Amino acid sequence: MKRLATGSIALTLLLAAAAQAQAPRAPRAPPAPAPRDANGHVSFSGSAKDIGNWEGPANASIFFEITDGKKVSPAASLPTNPSLDDVPFQPWAKELYLKRHASLQADDPHTRCKPSGGPRMFHTPYGLEIVNSPDTNEVFVLAVGAPHSWRVIYTDGRAHPQGFKPSWYGHSVGKWEGDTLVVDSTGYNARAWLTREGVPYTDKLRLTERISRPDHNTLRYEATVDDPGAYTAKWGGGWTLRWSEGNEPFDYLCQENNRDPGRMTGPKGE
C-alpha cells in the first residue's frame, strides 16, 4: 500500500508539472518609456532614483560585422549595417584597415590611452554616460573608463566656428528631430580610429549621428560617415546600447592600469 501511495504522489506531481509547462506564460511587461528632461526632450541620463549607465555591444565589429572573414550579426547591430564589401573604401583606406585589422592593438591609439574619437566612444566596454543639460542647451557624452574623456554637443542653435583647431572629438552641434538628437560634427584631427577594428578616416570627416532612446532600457546609435579623403561615398551603420541599472562611474586611469610596455615603445610609442 505504501508503494502504491508513493507512486500516486509521483504521478500527481508529474501531471502537475506537465500542466504547468503547458500553461501559457504571462506576457512580459513592456519596458518603461524613456524619461524626459525639463524641456520635454527625451533624456539620455539617469536620475537620483535611477542610477545606471549605458553598456555598448560586446562585439568589436560594429559598422560591419566580420570575424575572421565571416559576417556575423550580433543582436546589438542594426539590420541596415553594411558588409565589409559594401563599404566604399578608397584603396589606401582599405589597405590601412586590413593592416590594422590583422594586428589589432599594435597601433591602436587606445593602447597609449588616447581618446576614442567619433563613434568608437559609443562602443566603450567600460560604460557610457550621456547627460542632458536643459539649462545650458548642451548634451555631455562621458566615457567612464579608459582615457576618461568627454565631448560636448551644443543644442543652442550655434554654427560650427570658423578656423576651429582640429581635435580628437571635433566640434559637435545638435538639433532635435522629434525624439531623436541629430548631431553634426566636423573638425577631427584624424588621429583616432572610427571603430575598435581600425576603420580609418581623415581630417575631411563630417560625421552625422542620430541618437534616440526608444524605451527606458535601450539607446539607439546611428552614424553616417562623410569623408571624401578616405571613401568614395557616404556610408554608415549603428547599434544599440543597453541601460545597466545600478552601475555608476568608477575611477579608472588608463595610464596607471597599462601593463603592456612592449606596445608603448618603438616609433608609435610617443
Task: Label each residue range with its predicted role.
Residues 1-4:
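Positively charged n-region of N-terminal signal peptides that target proteins for export
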Residues 8-16:
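Bacterial N-terminal signal peptides
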Residues 20-270:
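PEST-like low-complexity, intrinsically disordered acidic/proline/serine-rich tracts
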